[in-house]
A protein has these predicted regions:
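N-terminal subdomain of nucleotide-sugar transferases
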Residues: 1-62, 104-106
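Structural motif
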Residues: 2, 109-110, 129
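Redox-cofactor binding/interface segments in oxidoreductases and associated redox assembly factors
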Residues: 5, 113, 132
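Short, solvent-exposed loop/turn segments at secondary-structure junctions
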Residues: 10-11, 43-45, 68-69, 116-119, ...
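Short loop/helix-cap segments at secondary-structure boundaries that form the rim of catalytic
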Residues: 51-55, 121-127
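Conserved nucleotide-sugar donor-binding subdomain of glycosyltransferases
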Residues: 67, 72-125
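Active-site proximal beta-strand in glycosyltransferases
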Residues: 126-142
Length: 142
């Protein structure tokens, strides 16, 4: 299968809970013979550089680099809207462009979304099956 895997934290290196689970899923899917493309956010140039190691575990990856001040402003801008403010926090126009390009450029068998906050990147896609892993769903947030 050709799988587009979208997650809210860049999954490499796998040294925290928000990275370990998606990393292991990506590694398993790739080892099982699936073509996996990872799309995610990096919070700094250093994290983006460190994250390059994911290339050994997937076919390719795309990332958007975001910063805390910009993420916070995007989150606050969404407060008067009916959509969750966390969608603003996890939105990257650069990553959205990359995801859109990937979706148009090739045929996908599955879109796997790890965490609800990044489902926005593929919410308009109707022609590809999607799995949404609510790994971020807990009573303290919702």
């Amino acid at each position: 299968m050709n799988i587009l895997y979208i997650c809210h934290r860049f999954p490499f290196p796998p040294k925290r809970g928000g990275k370990i689970r998606p990393f292991n899923m990506i590694r398993h899917l790739s080892a099982s013979g699936h073509r996996v493309t990872v799309c995610s956010l990096a919070r700094s140039a250093a994290e983006a550089e460190e994250g390059q190691g994911i290339a050994a575990h997937c076919e390719r990856f795309a990332m958007g680099i975001v910063s805390e001040p910009v993420q916070t402003l995007r989150m606050v801008a969404r407060l008067p809207l009916t959509t969750p403010s966390s969608m603003g926090y996890f939105h990257s126009p650069a990553l959205q462009r990359q995801v859109d390009h990937l979706l148009q450029a090739e045929k996908w068998d599955l879109i796997f979304v790890h965490c609800s906050s990044v489902a926005q990147y593929v919410e308009r896609v109707r022609t590809v099956p999607k799995i949404l892993d609510f790994g971020d769903m807990d009573s303290q947030k919702w």
